[in-house]
Amino acid sequence: MWPLSHRHLCLAFLLVCVLSAISFFLHIYQDSIRHGLGLSILCPDRLVTAPVAIFCLPDSPMSPNTSSPCPQHPASLSGTWTIYPDGRFGNQMGQYATLLALAQLNGRRAFILPAMHATLAPVFRITLPVLAPEVDSSTPWRELQLHDWMSEEYADLGDPFLKLSGFPCSWTFFHHLREQIRSEFTLHDHLREEAQSVLRRLRLGRSGDRPRTFVGVHVRRGDYLQVMPQRWKGVVGNSAYLREAMDWFRARHEAPVFVVTSNGMEWCRENIDASKGDVMFAGDGQEASPWKDFALLTQCNHTIMTIGTFGFWAAYLAGGDTVYLANFTLPDSEFLKIFKPEAAFLPEWVGINADLSPLWTLAEP
C-alpha cells in the first residue's frame, strides 16, 4: 500500500470536519423542531413559539399580528405626523382618532403631544407614542387645519412632517377602523369597574327590580347655553326633547332605566320628569374630571345625546341605539358651514328635531 501524501491527509481531515458540521446542524435542527424553537433573520410574518431568537434588519417588514421586539412602526410607514391638542375631553378624543386614521391612510407614523397624553392616558389605554418637546420644536412642520368631515385630499397628503389642527370629530374619518378606535379608547379597569358598580346598584323606583336595559343620557349645558343662541343661532336639548327621546326607548325596550349625566345636573333634576321611577340622576357633573360621567355612559346599552363631542363619543363607544338632537340651528346659521350633520351622526342613529321657537322669538324686533 502506498503511504498517504500530505495532500490526501488534508483532504481527509476537511471531509471529516464537513461531515461533523453537517451532523451537528442536523442535530440542532431536529432539537429545535422538537422543542418549538424558531430562528428568524427577519421580523417574522407569523407568530412563533417561544423561545425565539429574532434579528430585525433595518426596514424589514412586520405583520400587524406579530408579537416581537421589532420596531412598532412597519417599514412602509415614514415621516412624523401629530395634531394640536385643542379643546376639552371630547374634542381631544376626536383629534386622536382622526390623527390615527389619517396617518394610517397616508402611510405615516402618528405621535401625540404631551398635553393630549395627559388628557387621555389617565382614562384610556391609548397606544400612540408621545412626541418629545425637543423633537416637536426642531421638526420642520407643515401645518394643516382640518374641517370636520373626510375629504378626498386628506387621503393623499404627501407631507412627511405634518402637524394637523382643528376640531375633527366625524365618523367619516375613522369609522372604517371602528374596532381599533374602540380598542384605543378602552377604559382602564378601575374606571370601568367603578361605573359598573354604580349601574349594579340602580333599581327601578316603582318595583325595586334591577333594570334590564340601561340608557345613558348626556345633557350638554354650561357654556352652550350662551354660545348656541348668541353665536350659532342654535339651541340645546330641552325637556320636551328629552321626554320624547325617553319615550322612544320606553316603546322599544322593556323596563329601561335612564342614567342621566350632565354639566347642569340641577337643571336636569328640575326639568326631567322622573315620576315613572325609571330616571336616575347618576352623574356628578364635574367638568374638571369628566371621565367618571363618561365611563358611566359608555357602560350603558344605549344613548340619548343632545349636542357636543362628549355625547358623540359616549354613544359611539357604548354602541346600541342612539337618539340625538337634530336640526338644532336655524337654516342660515354660520355653524352649518363648519358642521355637516350627515358626517357627524351615524346613519343608523335616530334624530329628533329640536324646538327652534325660542330662536324665532329672539329674532323678532
From Swiss-Prot:
GO cellular component, alphabetical, reads:
Golgi cisterna membrane
Q: Where would you find this protein in the cell?
A: Golgi apparatus, Golgi stack membrane
UniProt key word Cell membrane: no
Q: Which UniProt keywords apply?
A: Glycoprotein, Glycosyltransferase, Golgi apparatus, Lipid metabolism, Membrane, Signal-anchor, Transferase, Transmembrane, Transmembrane helix
Is Membrane a UniProt keyword of this protein? yes
Lumenal side of the membrane: what ranges? 26-365
Give me the reactions it catalyses. a beta-D-galactosyl-(1->4)-N-acetyl-beta-D-glucosaminyl derivative + GDP-beta-L-fucose = an alpha-L-Fuc-(1->2)-beta-D-Gal-(1->4)-beta-D-GlcNAc derivative + GDP + H(+); a ganglioside GA1 + GDP-beta-L-fucose = a ganglioside Fuc-GA1 + GDP + H(+); a beta-D-Gal-(1->3)-beta-D-GlcNAc-(1->3)-beta-D-Gal-(1->4)-beta-D-Glc-(1<->1')-Cer(d18:1(4E)) + GDP-beta-L-fucose = alpha-L-fucosyl-(1->2)- beta-D-galactosyl-(1->3)-N-acetyl-beta-D-glucosaminyl-(1->3)-beta-D-galactosyl-(1->4)-beta-D-glucosyl-(1<->1')-N-acylsphing-4-enine + GDP + H(+); a neolactoside nLc4Cer(d18:1(4E)) + GDP-beta-L-fucose = a neolactoside IV(2)-alpha-Fuc-nLc4Cer(d18:1(4E)) + GDP + H(+)
Q: Which sequence ranges are listed under topological domain Cytoplasmic?
A: 1-8
Glycosylated residues?
N65, N301, N327
**How the protein sits in the membrane?**
Single-pass type II membrane protein
The membrane-spanning stretches of this chain are 9-25
- Role played: Catalyzes the transfer of L-fucose, from a guanosine diphosphate-beta-L-fucose, to the terminal galactose residue of glycoconjugates through an alpha(1,2) linkage leading to H antigen synthesis that is an intermediate substrate in the synthesis of ABO blood group antigens. H antigen is essential for maturation of the glomerular layer of the main olfactory bulb, in cell migration and early cell-cell contacts during tumor associated angiogenesis. Preferentially fucosylates soluble lactose and to a lesser extent fucosylates glycolipids gangliosides GA1 and GM1a.
- For this entry, the protein name equals Galactoside alpha-(1,2)-fucosyltransferase 1
Gene coding for it: FUT1
